[in-house]
Amino acid sequence: TTHYLLLQALADEGIDPSSMTILDLRPNDIAAAWARGDLDAAWFWEPNLDKAVERGGNIFMTSGIMEKRGYPTWDVGVVMKKFAKEYPEYVEKFVKAECAGIDYWINNPAETAKIIAKELSLDLEDATRMMKGTEMVPCKKQLTSKYMGTSEDIGGFADTLVKTSKFLVSQKR
């Protein structure tokens, strides 16, 4: 989705992507290239973003800004219909666990940061900063028209998924 956001941001600003060299790199490779001074610009995230700023980088675009421009991006979990029909109890358990995790994140940020730091081998400061840049949407709010919606009222996520899918097809991804 970062590639999608980058190209949408360039289009919004009237910049032709063919006027530059765009590289598709993994996060750690971006950070290393940035540290070496090999890149003029990059779209990446914590824990490397803060380090880039410390080395003279300036944040001029974020996924939050792009969401306000009409390009939200999402992290979602999906299952195949066949799996959901065969194992509805597992799907229900997963959704409940996911919702409990989101609630824990929202209600216990300090403890969540410790867990993330340990799990991802990050400094606590990096994990805390990373969390601040991540919006966790409570499950009840996900069932509103802005997000997933309901079976009777399909939410904005469906539109976003269609736009992103068309983009990925156009990029042969």
Label every model-predicted segment:
Residues D29-L120, E125:
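Pocket-lining segment of extracytoplasmic ligand-binding domains
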Residues T21-L23, F60-M61:
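General small-molecule cofactor/ligand-binding pocket signal
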Residues T2, P27-I30:
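Conserved donor sugar-nucleotide recognition element shared by glycan-biosynthetic enzymes
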Residues H3-T21, V53-R55:
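Ligand-binding cleft/hinge of the Venus flytrap
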Residues K85-R173:
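Secondary-structure end/capping motifs
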Residues T21, L39-D40, G155:
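Residue-level marker of alpha-helix boundaries and capping positions
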